Structures are given as structure tokens and as C-alpha cells.
Amino acid sequence: MPMVTVKYNFQLFKCKVSLNSTLNDVLHQSIQFFQLHTSSNDWSLIHLDKPVPLDLPWRLLNLPTGVNLELSKSSNFPVANKTNREDIPFNTIKIRFQIPGRDSVVKEMPSDQPIAPILRQMSGAAGDDFKIQVFSKIIEFKTIKDENLTLENLGIQEPSSVRLIFNNTSHSEGISANSAIHPKQTPPTMTNPETVASLPPHELHKPSVFLPSDEPLAVIKDQIEDEEDYELTVEQAKKYQKMLSSKAGTLGGPILTKRLREQSANNLPKKNKAISECLLRVKFPDRSHIQIAFKPNEDMRTVYNVVSQFLIDENMPFTLNQSHPFKPLAKDDKKLLDDLEFGSKTMLLFETNSNSNGPLIKAHLLEDAQKITHETRTTPSVNTINKSNPQGPSDNATSIKKTLNRVPKWMKLSKK
């Protein structure tokens, strides 16, 4: 923190200042330290035989740290002399009043004129229940009114900005209503078709049936899609960088041990993602799947009732189990999100005591069923959902690329 030294009659006074504080505060502290029972307007701080502005923040004064300032009477300097300006009109200073909810207002006013009437005019219907902010200071309007303060008393000697802070909520609502009459026109945002798009929510309690593929697993593994699907996105890079920084500490900081990492992780608030729907996929013994969307506040009793509606035998006794860790879920009033802590997508296992190994789902639902591998191939990624796909679904087998027989660019040898 910068240090300022004030000299007066061979005495020294050292004071610490912040970057946003003004030398007007230093002047008041110096007068109190040297026990000068006069007004602060009669004194000024001198540096290199010139008065220093008292209304500018420290970071704008361009003064070195530990600068030596001299406390002197303002009568010794005609610029700050108040008694010698009786025949000279006071300076007119431009002040910009910033009012929340309205445009800024610029007014010219003498530096010796009380600012309470002008502030009352600017505040409108707020009355006396507001404050003003000058640089880093916040002053009540009642104090300005009672002490009859002027711009000189506030340390303002040059064009400055004054912010009005209202405490009354009704006045702020009135301002927002006035601003709503003349809304600001914002230019329309341009959207890129290749930007990330959010998938629409699923229809609640509507089933989607998926059947296992007839192709061997070896054939499915050899079917490699386009290499663009494996490119690292910006979100994935940020997530990976955050994981590395949490393990090794931030750049330039100390390396955190395992205990400190666990302690910092426990101190962080849990940021629960806003889940709008719980997508449950039930796997049957014949490897068929049925996918149903539920609300997060629905219970397991509703899940059991909805799943039983799509069975051939609706009165069949069955049990839904959590896949990992394996846990039977009872038909009770436990909420999906609050009690069972289900995510946006959850897999459940269907278990029954019936000896039937055939299809358990109704026939009209099986007619519209999709292959599981077909779903994973044709479903576009979120980042490329708006990209055009000129090829139809029928020639998926021909569009699949095999990169095992291709030579990468970095492995090609030069012909020289």
C-alpha cells in the first residue's frame, strides 16, 4: 500500500493511502495530527512548489510511492487562495450525475454553491432517502443538507462524476417503469448454424423402444465414424485444464497436497445442475429397452404405473433395479431427484418372476422400435446438430470410414 509523508513545521506525518482514495482524506488526517483548528479549505498539499489536486484518486496522480508533501496555507498560493478570490467569480465545474434507471445528466454549477437543492431536483420523488457516491466515498443526503456542503467541501475541483444511490424500493420500481416506456433497442444477435444447440425436451410418459442389433460386436467395433467426432472441443479443454489445476494447484501458486485438495473440494458449494427431466431407460431380460421421460419431482410409484401400461400383461409383478450399484427400487413415494438422486439419464433393470422369455412389451410399440446401434450412429452430436447431412440413412454402411488402412500424414516419408 502506498505511503505518503506530510511535512509541517519540521514535523512529519506518515499516512497510508489506497489506490482509490483521494488526498483530501490525507489533508483531513494531517490537520488533525498537527492539531490545526481551522477549516480544511484553508490548507493545501504542495509537491514541487505546486498544489496537488485533492479530488483525484491516488492512481491518477502519478506520484511516486513515499512522496513527500508539504502542508501549507492556501493563502501562499493564489490558485487555492480563498480569501483573495472575493472579487473573482468562482470556477464553474461540470458535474455528471449518474442516476440508476435513467440517462446521465451533465450540469454546470459553481464550486461554492450548495449542492443539496440540485441533488433534490435530480432525485425526483425519492425525497431525502438516498446517498451520493463521489469517487470511493458514500455520503448521506441528510449530511449534505444539514452541513450545507459544496463541491469544495467534497474535494471536487475539476469536472467529475456523482452517482445517486437510492434506498427506497418504490422509487427504483418507478424508475424501472419509466425506463420500460422507452425501451432501448438492442441489435439482433447473429446465430451461427454450427454453434452448439440444445436438444428439445422429451414428451413426458411417451415410450421409445430400442431393440439390440443383429450385427456381431466385432463388426460394430470396426465401424469407425468420421474423425471430426473425436476432435477436442473448447468445453472439453477447459474441463481438462480445470481438472489439472485442481490436482496440481493454480499457476504460480503452491502445489496442493491430497489433503488440501479434498479440504478445498469439501468447502466448495455443491453446484447441482438444473435437471428439467429424468430420462429413464428400462432394460428387459430379452435385451430390449424402453425409454420414458419423467419429471424430477415424480415418485417411483408413478414410474411403476407408467411402465406397467406398456407391458403385455399389465398386472405382471415386477421389480425395477438400479444398475450400478445394484439396488432394488421399491414402489413407494420417493422422489426421483431429491430422494433417489437420479440424473438426467438413468438405466434401470427390469426383473420379474415370470418364466416367459419372450417380448414383454406390447406389439404396437415393437413395430416402431429402433436398433440400438442405429440410434448411436445416426444421432448427431450436440456440437454438429445443425450441420447438413446430404447422405440418407440408407447408405450408412457405405459412408462409414475405416482409418485402419490409411497412412497418417505425419508418417508419410519424403520422396527426396
UniProtKB/Swiss-Prot annotation:
Renumbered residue ranges of the record's region Disordered: 376-402
One Gene Ontology term of the molecular function aspect: protein-containing complex binding
Residues in UBX domain copies: 273-350
SUPFAM superfamilies: Ubiquitin-like
Ranges of biased composition (kind: Polar residues): 378-402
Tagged with keyword Phosphoprotein: no
Pfam families: TUG-UBL1 (PF11470), UBX (PF00789)
Transmembrane domains' residue ranges: none
Function: Involved in CDC48-dependent protein degradation through the ubiquitin/proteasome pathway.
Name of protein: UBX domain-containing protein 4
Annotated organism of origin: Saccharomyces cerevisiae (strain ATCC 204508 / S288c) (Baker's yeast)
Gene for this chain: UBX4
